[in-house]
Amino acid sequence: MTVKLVLASKSPFRSALLKNAGIEFSTASADIDERAVEAPLYESGATPEDVAQILAEAKAIDVSEKNPGAVVIGCDQTLSLGDEIFHKPHDMEAARRQLQKFSGKTHQLNSAVVLARDGKTLWRHVSIAHMTMRDLDAGFIGRYLGRVGDIALSSVGAYQVEGPGIQLFEKIDGDYFTIVGLPLLPLLAELRREKCIDG
């Protein structure tokens, strides 16, 4: 294929998913202030799904404007518990508080992926996963965070289901790729439709 693909993310997890799928691509970081973009969206009543899609689109558009002719993949993930929105914890105490809030409850992961070329959106998709944590006591949360260390700070939920974080859960409703932040099957289907990959 002659179409250049660019992943608008420096996430090693998203890169690994695409590499494992046999996709050739480069990476570039978007130059956007995510918190500045999302604050007015939430104030105007946007849903967490909307916010994930708008942020993914902003990243894809930004990088596509700097990479003429390339098809750019933008991604974003939001986490909500009821009306409360969560971001990556900034330190271990914030991670501990998040896990205490999630304990025994079901939160929602909203993973958006957008394709853009030359500053124009080609395609958008949002997938949702419902994540039910088991009841966690403070001792277990402390031991879990001690075991995983700073990796807890690299994920919006302070966990990664591909590692010890899976032990936090009682039930998961949703696609694995949605949970790890890149709805891969819909993305691959669209890349085939756009003739970006063989198919």
From Swiss-Prot:
Signal peptide: none annotated. GO terms for biological process: nucleotide metabolic process. It catalyses: N(7)-methyl-GTP + H2O = N(7)-methyl-GMP + diphosphate + H(+). InterPro entries: ITPase-like_fam, Maf-like. One of its GO terms (cellular component) is cytoplasm. Its EC number is 3.6.1.-. Its main location: cytoplasm. It holds the Pfam family Maf. One of its GO terms (molecular function) is nucleoside triphosphate diphosphatase activity. Belongs to the Maf family. YceF subfamily. This is 7-methyl-GTP pyrophosphatase. It comes from Brucella suis biovar 1 (strain 1330).
